[in-house]
Amino acid sequence: MLAYRPRGATEATRLRSSSLGGFAAAGVAAKAQALPLLIALLVAAPAFAQAPPPPPHDMQAMPDQQEYPRLKISGFGDLNFATTKHPEGPRGFVEGQLALHMASQLSSRVTFFGEISFTPRGDAGTGSPATSGFNVEVERMVVRFDRNDRLKVSFGRYHTPVNYWNTAFHHGQWLQTTIARPELIQFGGRFLPVHFVGALVEGAVPARGWNLNYKAGVGNGRGPVLSRAGDAGDVNGKRSWLVNAYSKPDALFGLEFGGALYVDTITMPGAREFGERIVSAYAAWQKEEPELIAEFAAVRHQENGSGTDSWSRAFYVQAAWRLPPLERAFKPYYRFEHVGIDEADEVFAPLPELDMSIVGLRYDVSLHAAAKAEYRTWTRGDGSVRNHGGFFQVCFTF
């Protein structure tokens, strides 16, 4: 290892290697030359003292003054492995999704939030020209104006506040306990509308410790592909609207419960239009010891001009517990899911019914990385064929 030697020490060594006589002579000459300069500095010192240097830039600003915009970026990623008895979905090692969250304070009352995802394609390199290896998607893009805690108005592309999971756990598998979302609110799923493009009004009211929160919005309905929001405009000119209300009571810290109503008109192939009404309810206890989440959603479809309607229903129940030993790094969990499709539901006709049980364990390797392992068993359709498999995930935030 090279030892650090200050420059002054090196210079002193060189001088010591010279003759003593030369050193003394040089010193006398230097003193003679420095004397006039020293006198000049002493005479000018009072003048310099009367003109102090200007204060630094940050000292000139007012104490409460902020600089805008202020941008913060955080990222999430995951890598997966899957093996199943019967072929269904990706198997082997699978590159997960890379997500970037961007939050920017534009002023004391205006904020922006954006979310971009990069998802690997199964058909990468095929076609002419060849498809790219990833789909790049603007998941959320919201600008919000805050009047106060009771009134906030925003515009953009949201995760639809139609249930609890969709607004509690965004893109980034590290954020949630389990490897995957529940089937009823899967990204790319069709049972509930995951994204919403429009305007939203929200706020919170203390209400004697009940801490009531509300959201109300209007925007474009589902696109021709049910899993897509109307990013480029409403497909039929009939706006969707929603209301959401929930409570976080002070008396039961960690508890949140509420519900939502979503109304839309869906245009199917052949220009057939169906009225859609979604009602949902949930309760969530997020204290880690335990973590309990239960949600129910019912979707009603009725073709315009017809008296026949259908109701499809789905729910899930999830329980987890953060174990005290080993610095609370281990968190076992269980989830049961059910999706029931009405035989008369023409909109959801392609969707199979589902019953699934998941047993898993999350291990937080550090504050910013985790590993998850799951065993799943499930049936689809009429339930005659049962599948099961093992799943593993490494996820992180940066």
Go through each PLM region and give its residues:
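N-terminal secretory signal peptides that target proteins for export/translocation
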Residues: 1-30
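Bacterial N-terminal signal peptides
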Residues: 31-46
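Boundary at the C-terminal end of the N-terminal hydrophobic targeting segment
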Residues: 47-51
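Outer membrane beta-barrel
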Residues: 59-224, 237-239, 246-253, 316-322, ...
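Outer-membrane beta-barrel pore domains
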Residues: 83-88, 129-133, 142-146, 154-157, ...
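A short secondary-structure junction signal
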Residues: 211-213, 225-231, 269-270
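C-terminal/domain-terminus segments
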Residues: 223-231, 387-393
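Interfacial loop-to-helix transition and helix-capping segments at the boundaries
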Residues: 230-238
